[in-house]
């Protein structure tokens, strides 16, 4: 790969940073050598009703996996995100809402949000929702989604947020698995100018005869287009809050009481309901938010994630609100109505901290300077990346173009199951390398092991595991602790297995190489797909690439690359040869793609992740069972790829 140089900590950042390099090392050493002392102190970042005496009580032992933090303490999450800020910053903005339509935006203060949450919490009680009941939330990106989540937390109900892009079948499956008692939705959502039929999807989902627990559907009016209405079951949000009291004392919750279930796709079988509890999760979300984004009071923070993903839970809502931050919620997409929308939103709201995904960055990068046309983005101080490894070229483009070459990028590695950041730079403490997640956060003990579980010391590559618990860790899979142990703790005994591979360089920095099932073995050489993709995307004519392995009778696996070119570029035989030589030059002959498949679009989930499972099957010609495609943003892409594959005559 291209020569990696370090980006030093900018002086302007170092002067005001919350954590400097010395503090990072000191805190980190304390956090791994004496976790009780470290977390005992830092657990105080939030307010406790009954303070904890026990800090950590955890085991990764086979057959006895048990994770408990602050287990004798009590608290309420909503009180931490709202009530405790009222005296000092009740009139400060809590949420800036930017609509899909650039002419629509509004602000919600902490006082207003508190009022709305208390009111809606009383609505939930009136509908028969009790502490411990599960509430399904299938909402667009509007402040009311946050109100619904916080209202659940206020009364001790468990929320299960379902991303607004999921199909009726996916919604039904999640309602059944979690035994939800209520659904909260909207008539429609709006995204990139198009209406999303949320209520219609819920109606469809509830036709499933296995759903018997739902008595009511609360409907928020977003567009005014609700087609079907079932009297007695469906109730309007605005009607319910009319006479609801605004007085709702927060429920006292044990630290280990469930807070939310969030479904994540497994590599096999049905989605897994990842369960997070209240105390450890909020401590971890708040602490990671504060230090990783170097958040200072008054900063305007924008996380582009949907509330339906863990990033939306931890870093759009709970982490920021627990810290009394100003958080921007965006209904739209970064390239609508124009490709410079991201920059326009930054300028309009004077955003200081931006947190987005490589898939968005690459989409803008393909547009070149059009993506920043007419925008200044000078308010930005810190930028972040989440969702998948960011290739160095996209990192540099993001750094130079969006951030005007002055904003540190926090490239965060974490998962739904981890609750918060695991490996990440800290702006005032970490020199950066493009494409590296750098070093572990406090209390996180990563290790690299070979396939037999032997630790790899020094600069090495291997399976990424975590050797001890941290407060934000998921406690179980809802209703299936056996699957929890099987999935995360059975591959390498006594360790949490992330499912990702990584390499550690001579500076101790971690580089995520992609899912372990995305590792190619070509003639006995291990190659991470992320590395080959980075090489491809560094070619000036390539916008996006996805690499998979296909069976090869001599090499074991051949390298099959799906490639999307920048606008205005056309595939030619010359370019085919040029691209193969380019990768050979960047990585070496062993990494040269055997087959290039030109395509306009890749199959992505609605959170922007490329569905490699489908790409592997298409590449191998195994199209009999492509599995569940309901989570794809555009299921039509699959047929298009199959047609392209049929008509392809790969040059020999």
From Swiss-Prot:
Catalysed conversion reaction: acetate + ATP + CoA = acetyl-CoA + AMP + diphosphate
Cofactor(s) it depends on: Mg(2+)
Keywords: Acetylation, ATP-binding, Ligase, Magnesium, Metal-binding, Nucleotide-binding
Pfam families: ACAS_N, AMP-binding, AMP-binding_C
Binding positions for ATP per the UniProt entry: 387-389, 411-416, 500, 515, 526
Binding positions (CoA): 191-194, 311, 335, 523, 584
EC numbers for this chain: 6.2.1.1
Gene Ontology terms describing biological process: acetyl-CoA biosynthetic process from acetate; chemotaxis
Top-tier EC class: ligase
Record InterPro entries: Ac_CoA_lig (IPR011904), ACAS_N (IPR032387), AMP-bd_C (IPR025110), AMP-bd_C_sf (IPR045851), AMP-binding_CS (IPR020845), AMP-dep_synth/lig_dom (IPR000873), ANL_N_sf (IPR042099)
Residues annotated for Mg(2+) binding in this entry: 537, 539, 542
Entry PTM: Acetylated. Deacetylation by the SIR2-homolog deacetylase activates the enzyme.
HAMAP family from the UniProt entry: Ac_CoA_synth
Protein name: Acetyl-coenzyme A synthetase
């Amino acid at each position: 790969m291209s020569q990696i140089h370090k980006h030093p900590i900018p002086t302007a950042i170092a002067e005001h940073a919350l954590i400097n390099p010395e503090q990072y090392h000191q805190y980190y050493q304390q956090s791994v050598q004496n976790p009780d002392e470290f977390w005992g102190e830092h657990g105080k970042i939030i307010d406790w009703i009954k303070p904890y005496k026990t800090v950590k009580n955890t085991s990764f032992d086979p057959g006895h996996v048990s994770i408990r933090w602050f287990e004798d303490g009590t608290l309420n999450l909503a009180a931490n995100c709202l009530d405790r800020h009222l005296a000092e910053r009740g009139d400060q903005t809590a949420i800036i809402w930017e609509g899909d339509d650039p002419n629509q935006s509004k602000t919600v203060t902490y006082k207003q949000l508190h009022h709305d949450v208390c009111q809606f919490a009383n609505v939930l009680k009136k509908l028969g929702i009790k502490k411990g009941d599960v509430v399904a939330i299938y909402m667009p990106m509007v402040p009311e989604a946050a109100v619904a989540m916080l209202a659940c937390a206020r009364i001790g109900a468990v929320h299960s947020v379902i991303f607004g892009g999921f199909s009726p079948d996916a919604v039904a499956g999640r309602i059944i698995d979690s035994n939800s008692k209520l659904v909260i939705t909207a008539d429609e959502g709006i995204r990139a100018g198009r209406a999303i039929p949320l209520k219609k999807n819920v109606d469809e989902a509830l036709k499933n005869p296995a759903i018997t627990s739902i008595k009511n559907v609360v409907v928020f009016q977003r567009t005014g287009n609700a087609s079907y209405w079932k009297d007695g079951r469906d109730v309007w949000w605005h009607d319910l809050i009319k006479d609801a009291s605004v007085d709702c004392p927060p429920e006292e919750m044990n630290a280990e009481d469930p807070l939310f279930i969030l479904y994540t796709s497994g590599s096999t079988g049905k989605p897994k309901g990842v369960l997070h509890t209240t105390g450890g999760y909020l401590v971890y979300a708040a602490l990671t938010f504060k230090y990783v984004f170097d958040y200072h009071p008054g900063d305007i923070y924008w996380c582009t994630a949907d509330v339906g993903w863990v990033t939306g839970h931890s870093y759009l809502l709970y982490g920021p609100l627990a810290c009394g931050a100003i958080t921007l919620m965006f209904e739209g997409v970064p390239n609508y109505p124009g490709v410079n929308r991201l920059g326009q939103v930054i300028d309009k709201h004077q955003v200081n901290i931006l947190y987005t995904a490589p898939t968005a960055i690459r989409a803008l990068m393909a547009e070149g300077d059009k993506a920043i046309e007419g925008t200044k983005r000078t308010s930005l101080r810190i930028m972040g990346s989440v969702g998948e490894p960011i290739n160095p070229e996209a990192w540099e483009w993001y750094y130079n173009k969006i951030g005007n070459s002055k904003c540190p990028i926090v490239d965060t590695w974490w998962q739904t199951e981890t609750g918060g950041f695991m490996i990440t730079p800290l702006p005032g403490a970490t020199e950066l390398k493009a494409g590296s997640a750098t070093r572990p956060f406090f209390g996180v003990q990563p290790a690299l092991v070979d396939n037999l579980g032997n630790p790899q010391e020094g600069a090495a590559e291997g399976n990424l595991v975590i050797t001890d618990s941290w407060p934000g860790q998921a406690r179980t899979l809802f209703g299936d602790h056996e699957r929890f142990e099987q999935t995360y703790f059975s591959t390498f005994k006594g360790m949490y297995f992330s499912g990702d591979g990584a390499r550690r360089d001579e500076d101790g920095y971690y580089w995520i190489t992609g899912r372990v099932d995305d590792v190619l073995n070509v003639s006995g050489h291990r190659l991470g797909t992320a590395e080959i993709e980075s090489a491809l995307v560094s070619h000036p004519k390539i916008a996006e690439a996805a690499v998979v392995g296909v069976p090869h009778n001599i090499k074991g696996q051949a390298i099959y690359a799906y490639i999307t070119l920048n606008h205005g570029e056309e595939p030619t035989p010359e370019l085919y040869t040029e691209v193969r030589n380019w990768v050979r030059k960047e990585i070496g002959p062993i990494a040269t793609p055997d087959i290039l498949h030109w395509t306009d679009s890749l199959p992505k989930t609605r959170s922007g992740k490329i569905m490699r499972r489908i790409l592997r099957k298409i590449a191998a010609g195994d199209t009999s069972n492509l599995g569940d495609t309901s989570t794809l943003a555009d299921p039509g892409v699959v047929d298009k790829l199959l047609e392209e594959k049929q008509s392809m005559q790969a040059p020999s």
